[in-house]
């Protein structure tokens, strides 16, 4: 019997319209806008200035703190300016504008397709290389990878878990990456294992991707300590705590990190980025992004340079449909509506979803009928309707007492609510407020 996590969960329609589409390199735009905040933590600090010439892979900004990440140029050209620019958050924040001239790469980057299996670096050297290359988690959280590979005192890694679930509807970037870059991913996993000194890794893949499972299982025979584990389809299995529960049957306590359960969790795309950084000296400046939607002419998986406007993906997929109601950065469950198609692709951009006008209309909100469906599907075992009420009445003490900060913002509660209550929207606001109160209490 296939495993899955044991608390809550839903089964939204998959709508994997771009499944089976080969990864295609998207043409480089005339100008890229590269935000200095593409990760959780402190913004990176620019080390270039207006007029500087850069190459593909040139360091543009250094990590601004322990929890931060370097940022590299995705193009060759001239720095036009450093100014505020609109990003996926909806805010204007510092970014580097680069006018593209040619496609000259840093000489240290190995651009060959030759597979490099053996890693001769020590654990510390691997972590340092990952940090220097600006690698972050390529899911939505974009947590700097090197920090995850340095467990706090008193914690020891026992296993590396690779999140290849891709449970978010519509998105297929990870699926396509597994089919086309399977061997490189496995080498990346062995590097991650070496970085945290463990001899066991599990790649969790939902069983709606049988081709990826079969492909990686065939390749993994030649890689000691790596298991490919098919999982029962259930959303949000890609959540760290849910995946740990599914794979090793351990539950991470409230407020604790995955390492407390002995697990280091990384996205499959991150494993590939680690391979490229450590074995090919290639910083993280491009990634696979899905562009999709029921009205999209050609749903696709594109290899996109960071800083490329979303509009370029839309044009390459057949243009903006006339009946487009919303542009979503990410998927329909955890993604957020973008206020402009000129928002640039960043390290955390897994997909772009175009919803039709009909799909974008919110249903009328009605009174809660106390059915408790939201409680039953919450993968964190929370009471969403109570947390929404606490937020509406600004009862922050009640919200904190009922673990609002444990919410992973998966949207399962809103999805299942028969009264169409904006549970996630309100909980998100309340969570942000409570986290601010907790931070001020500690300072």
Tell me the role of every PLM-derived stretch:
Residues 198-310, 316-321, 331:
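Hydrophobic alpha-helical positions that pack around
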Residues 77-79:
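Conserved hydrophobic positions within beta-strands
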Residues 49-62, 81:
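Short, well-structured beta-strand-loop connectors
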Residues 106, 137, 160-174, 295:
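Gly-rich Lys/Arg/Thr-decorated short loops/hinges at beta-loop-alpha junctions or inter-strand turns
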Residues 1-47:
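N-terminal, Lys/Arg-enriched amphipathic/low-complexity engagement segments
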Residues 86-143, 154, 210:
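Acidic low-complexity segments
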Residues 179-195:
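Histidine-anchored nucleotide/phosphate-binding helix
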Residues 349-365, 375, 379-443:
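Ferredoxin-type iron-sulfur electron-transfer modules in oxidoreductases and energy-metabolism complexes
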